[in-house]
Amino acid sequence: MAKNKSQYDSTLNLPKTLFEMRAGLPKKEPVMLKDWDDNDLYNQLMKHNEGKPQFILHDGPPYANGNIHMGTALNKIIKDIIIREKNMEGFQAPYVPGFDTHGLPIELKALSSVGEKKKDISKLELRQICEKFATEHIDIMSDQFKRLGVIGDFEHPYLTLKPEFEARQIEIFGEMAKKGYIYKGLKPVYWCPDCRTALAEAEIEYGEDECDSIFVRFHVSQDPNGVLAKHGIPMEKTYFVIWTTTTWTLPANEAICLNGQFEYSFVKIGDEFHIMATDLVKSVMDSCHITEYEVVGEPVSGAEFELMRYNHVYLPKEGWVILGDHVTLESGSGCVHTAGGHGVDDFNVCQKYPQIPITVPVDDGGYLTEQAGKYAGQRVWASNKTILADLTASGAVMGQLHIKHQYPHCWRCHNPIIFRATEQWFCSIAKFREDVYKAIDTVTWMPDWGHDRMHGMVRDRNDWCISRQRTWGVPIPAFYCKKCGAYHITDATIKAVSDLFRKEGSDAWYKYDAEQIIPAGEVCEKCGASEWTKDTDIMDVWFDSGSTHAAVLEERPELRFPADMDMEGGDQFRGWFQSSLLTSVASKGCAPYKSVLCHGWVVDEQGKQMHKSAGNGVEPSEIIKDYGADIIRLWVASSDYTVDVRAGKNIFKQLSEAYRKIRNTARFILGNLDGFDPNTDCVADDQLQDIDRWALAALDDLIVNTNAGYAVYDFNKVYHAVYNFCVVAMSNFYLDVTKDRLYCTNGTGRKAAQTAMYKILVALDKIIAPILCFTSQEIWDFLPKTEAMNKYVVFEDMPKAGQYAADDAFKAKWAQLIAVRDEVKKVLEQARADKQIGASLEASVTLYCNDAVYDLLNSIPMDELADLMIVSHVELVKGEGGAASAVEGLGVAAAHATGDKCERCWKYSADIGTHAAHPTLCARCAAVVEG
């Protein structure tokens, strides 16, 4: 009797695997992480690649004060993809994570934690609380990075608070000081009155603020050159008109600056005369809503007004009229209110006139001092309204506009900042700026616009203010002579401080008096005295992180200087990229990195910045909980990270679908490799069918494209190549047309398909390993192994192109065969729509061919050609016929296949029942069943 249907099902080689369709990554990934940790994966990888060329990606240290966000995840995953790929490419690529641990945010958190006690707490006690806070967050962030699949030496990260780091930082400071690049001086700096400290340019962010834009007139008091008399203008009725948006700086006014190259006019309003740039008269009058005015006499060169005097608008003092090239005709009146204590240009131009004092009537908390007269005690922002009201009442204000403008804010407290001249420590960029330009030219910038951005920033920047008036940081290693006040920095003092810090850490600066630190025998170079005090400032945290090239690359035995790559977000052009570059060029004369790779910001699905208050943020922990870390990694790889990267729940949902297609490709192949032993079952190349060779050639193309993508860190190219290969080349074509051979046969043909699939999946898994680190290892665990294969896929070598390459003739042949197949599919779809057939195996196809097409198709065995079309029968006919197609010389006709349907393979055949024991099977299936 014939066997029943279920018995025939059991004779099929249907896919069988424990590799699950549903990934379950949120549960599986932690299990893998534990295995990696238990087996010391990172150190084993370093040992495995020992002796290979090094690739050093130097980690820019994130600030250790909170949970990671999507931007941090983007950054760390890009680095991890690079590290994993380089280790598989033939390098030993160590990854030493770092953490930036000093600075104001941690200090403020520490102060907040002690509440009212902060008034009584010592600096040393505060520093100990800060260190504890930073250390706790290092552990939290390290665990979060590892949860993303990031591998590295998390057991031994570099920390800017470590004694050995601080000691090396002091030495870098000393090297720069010895070369004359470090100095102390009075200069206007960015000052945060809320944080009560100076700020560097890298610590400034701009936001839109509203303010009053006012035109104020200052009465002329002296005309030593007789300019007014020469032009018949009465001095007692003449005023200079200035424009300002910082009313609070008027108490500090000491000068009005004109441009000596511009022409100025006398504008008569009523019986009074007002001096302003000729080209700006109309705009000033329009802004002040003055329609009745007259320009009197001929224009006068700005240079003629130099050293005239005027009365301050409310204080009992006179100011000077001076000249400066920074005065422009873009806005205002051409007469610039100049307060040397509150602006860089103002300060610089005042330096040319020794008689002009630098007045700073604002304390470190942003309150006006007694120098501001009756406004003393008012906060600068509040004083704007008071001063404006008084000046308006006195008639000094000619016009007023309420405007919105971009204004600098502190990036830590996010409040507006001021310019304030104070005694600070600076790095003199001007002294080695040309050397920095040369160093920039030696670096490979990715994207290449990075070169011009860095060059422009270095060109336009002022000297670097490196001192901060806070407690939690590396102290400025300077001593002061008690007798004359001169500061003292020598090779001996730098060595003494660095040795002390290396032994006890920078807390020692606060434990010991100056005499206990400074070497015996040191005397003041100015007065010869030998009694000392210590500096109370700390270094800018950008000097901390900017010293990593020395404190980490040069000190860690597994690393080296310079790094092959620094990779961070675009904001680091003014941050870590630049501070590292400056300290390296200043101390060593070269760049600290060979290449710089830059990524953009993470924004929401509409391209807007993420804010908690807007409710448009997405946290890595949420995505990991819902989808797993591999989906975040796929998001990184699928994005063009050189621009802003969009993230949101819809995007991750779409990516999970893309991931599923890649996973299911692997699952299908694994299912068909059940029982396959690559040590014994692989067939020789000459036993492969043509379509197997095509699949391997497609794999070779994939290897070429993905290797090219990895080489330039274009993971988006890698992702799209992998996705298209899995969906188009594999799922939609090769894996589909080989099903009959895999399911229904047991001979060489099946093993040929398995051999090709095995090679494909081994290579594919290696390709995706840097990106999908968890899934690739899961696939690897299920793959049948040869003795040469490692336990972990990341220990494997990346596939090399050429092993499966096909010549151009073969590729052209198969491109035409696929084109023919596409035309057949169109005709089958129409036959299905016309109810002639259901599944494509119900069809018989006749192909009408010219000689060239006939020869092409006839080169393929008819059973293989039928499998290619997924039909039961194919007939080739020379000549015209059937439906016209897009392939020249080809016509296609489809009909319902003749014969009966085989119960096992579902193909239609005339030989059904030729085996008496199996009346419902075709001859091939009956032979297979009988064995």
Where do the model's predicted regions map?
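Acidic, turn-prone loop/beta-hairpin segments
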Residues: 100, 189, 193, 199-207, ...
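N-terminal, positively charged nucleic-acid-binding surface of large information/translation enzymes
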Residues: 2-272, 339-352, 357-372, 396-436, ...
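Short cysteine-rich clusters marking metal-coordination/redox-active sites
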Residues: 192, 410, 481, 524-527, ...
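Cys/His-coordinated zinc-binding microdomains
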Residues: 196, 469, 485, 528-529, ...
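C-terminal accessory/binding modules appended to enzymatic or scaffolding proteins
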Residues: 321-322, 886-921
